[in-house]
Amino acid sequence: MSPIFYQKYWDFVGSSVINCVMNTLNSRRMPLGLNDTYICLIPKVKCPKKISEFRPISLCNIIYKVISKVLANRLKKILLEVISEEHSAFVPRRQITDNVFIAFETMHRINQKRDGKEGLMAIKLDMSKVYDRVKWAYLEEITRKLGFQERWISLTMMCVKTVSFSVLINGEPKGRIIPTIGLWQGDPLSPYLFLLCAEGLSAMLQREAYAGRIEGISVCREAPYISHLLFADDCMIFCKATMEEGNRVMGVLNNYEAASGQNLNKEKTSLFFFKNISRETKEKVKGLFGAQIIQQHETYLGLPPLVVRGRKKVSSRVKDQVGRKIIGWKGKLISNAGREILIKAVAQATPTYMMSCFLLPESLCNDLNSLARNFWWGQKENKRKVAWVSWEKLCTRKSEGGMGFKDLRAFNLALLAKQGWRILRKPNSLLHSVFKAKYSAMVSFMEAQLGRNPSYVWRSIVAA
């Protein structure tokens, strides 16, 4: 049954659903067939030929989803106390931009460092099929180590262990698969259980850092040392570029792989080194990890590097991304209402994530406004159309005669000001500690200036 069925006929089935959910949670016994799940294979590429080119999505029973969602909502409330501050995925009051700012600030430090006998490096890890490889015994034990009660552990493991799968082939379920490992994409509880699994890796790295065996990187003398950052399955590790620390990091990863079932994808793992490191050292560390060496800032959490020399390239990439979408719309007959929705929901929404982290060049904002303006007035290729109203007028509210389109420059500054406000209002966060130590150690955050050798992240926040 679809969710719409339960919503429409809740007056008739609501009490039965509530009783089923409560009985399952109280007895800790899953009714037979309630956790039967269909797997829908979504192609990752245009013409898939291998099974690895499909993304499996679990289609769970609706009543099971209610049970799982109840547990997920309860778990969500205590994640802030359980998950370490280096991990920001799915944790209330933490955002993906926290990791972005700290990572780019730390990479800026690596890129600008000129002194010191030993260099620094960043290791960007890529784990393959993280959900599918989680060992149930590890999940149960890490949950117990984090202090959860046995009743809670039995409830979560009930959800994990009672599942069975059938694969949808041409819309029909085929076969019956009984798994022994893994979590399922589509289960509301899975992202939070994976956070608990990843906390094991974070704890091992923290233990090495506290013991002084992995030094980590500090953006300045007063700032805390950052040994690693986690966002779901995305992990970045910072340490000295020596074989000694490299071996210790590799030892932690090997132990984590053996315990949790995770597998490091060495082909997609990358290393970024401090400039003055010798080629010999780079090759030794590269051989240890079996990873590739990158020469500039790596893309992190979907954001390209915004360094001075690469800013034009990034601007061109964003413009092309929006431009390709608009070109696809121009060949279709779209009403003015449809054009309005496409501009607001797609063309002007596409760069929002990047605008939340970086100040985009004004020329790029003007180019994006130009693309949206031309699409609004129906301009195709080189055939110019008359713009009967200025773009500035269209960006005003509808009550004032405009269309409510965004002024991208003002929107960019507003998003960055919001990030500055978050840093100011969360004095106990890791993000605040890093920026406070580097840019406003002797003054309040509101009085902070650019300072010496600021990163582009800080320049963007100050500009707002």
Protein language model features and the residues they cover:
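Nucleotidyl polymerases of mobile genetic elements and RNA viruses
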Residues: 1-446, 452, 456
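Short, intrinsically disordered, charge-balanced linker/junction segments flanking boundaries
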Residues: 458-464
